Regions:
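Hydrophobic alpha-helical transmembrane segments
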Residues: 22-27, 71, 100-105, 121-126, ...
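Juxtamembrane helix-loop-helix connectors linking adjacent transmembrane helices
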Residues: 5-77, 94-95, 165-174
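Structural signal for membrane-spanning alpha-helices in multi-pass inner-membrane proteins
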Residues: 1-5, 33-41, 110, 114, ...
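Active-site alpha-helix of zinc metalloproteases
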Residues: 73, 77-78, 86-87, 143-144
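Alpha-helical transmembrane segments of multipass membrane proteins
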Residues: 74-75, 79, 92, 107-112, ...
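Histidine-centered divalent metal-coordination motifs
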Residues: 86, 114, 148, 152
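Membrane-interface helix/loop boundary segments of multi-pass membrane proteins
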Residues: 48-59, 81-105, 133-139
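Functionally important transmembrane alpha-helices
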Residues: 119-174
Length: 174
C-alpha cells in the first residue's frame, strides 16, 4: 500500500466488473495452462530442481487441502498478486517511465518474486509479461486477475490430485 501511495497509483484503479473481460481472462489462461502441462511432462534437465521443489514443498503444504480451499487460495493469489504487480508496480511505474519499460520491469520483478529456481524465475518473468500485456490490451485488471486465478487453481488442483510423478523425478530419487 505504501508503494502504491509513493508511486501515486490507486490499488484498484483499473478494476471494474465486466463479464466480457472476465471471460477474456478465463480464456487467456489456456495458453499458460498448455505451457504448464507441457513443462510438467517434458523431459528437460533444467526442470529437475523445479520438480523437486513442487514435490517437497507445494505437495507437502497443499496436499491435504480440500478443492474449495485450493480455489480460495488461487483467487486470493490472483487478486493480490495482480493488484501488486500490475496495478501498483506496472501502473505506477508507467506513469514515470512509460508503458513498455514499466511492463518489462514489472515482469522481471514478478519473476524475481517467483524465484524458486532460475528456470522458473525465467518462466514467471514471461508469464508476468503475458499478464502485463493482457492488462494493457484489455484495460481492466479483472482480465489478468481471472487469468492468474484460473491458472493457479487448475495447475495446483491438477498437480495435487491427478498428476503422477514425472519420470525425471523418479530418476532423481533413484
Amino acid at each position: 500500500m505504501m508503494l502504491a501511495f509513493f508511486l501515486g497509483q490507486p490499488l484498484f484503479g483499473d478494476l471494474r466488473w465486466c463479464l466480457r473481460d472476465l471471460w477474456v481472462g478465463i480464456l487467456a489462461s489456456l495458453p499458460l495452462l498448455a505451457l504448464f502441462f507441457w513443462l510438467l511432462h517434458a523431459s528437460l534437465p533444467a526442470l529437475e530442481r523445479l520438480d523437486e521443489f513442487l514435490e517437497t514443498h507445494v505437495r507437502t503444504i497443499f496436499e491435504a487441502w480440500p478443492i474449495w480451499q485450493l480455489a480460495v487460495i488461487s483467487l486470493l493469489a490472483g487478486v493480490c498478486e495482480e493488484v501488486f504487480f500490475r496495478s501498483v508496480i506496472q501502473g505506477g511505474l508507467a506513469r514515470h517511465i512509460g508503458t513498455i519499460p514499466a511492463l518489462a520491469l514489472a515482469s522481471v520483478i514478478f519473476g524475481v518474486f517467483h524465484l524458486v529456481t532460475k528456470t522458473y524465475a525465467l518462466i514467471a518473468t514471461l508469464i508476468g509479461a503475458y499478464l502485463g500485456i493482457l492488462w494493457i490490451v484489455i484495460g481492466n485488471l479483472l482480465a489478468p486477475i481471472a487469468t492468474h486465478a484460473v491458472y493457479d487453481f487448475v495447475a495446483l488442483a491438477y498437480f495435487l490430485r491427478a498428476h503422477v510423478r514425472p519420470r525425471r523425478m523418479t530418476r532423481i530419487k533413484e
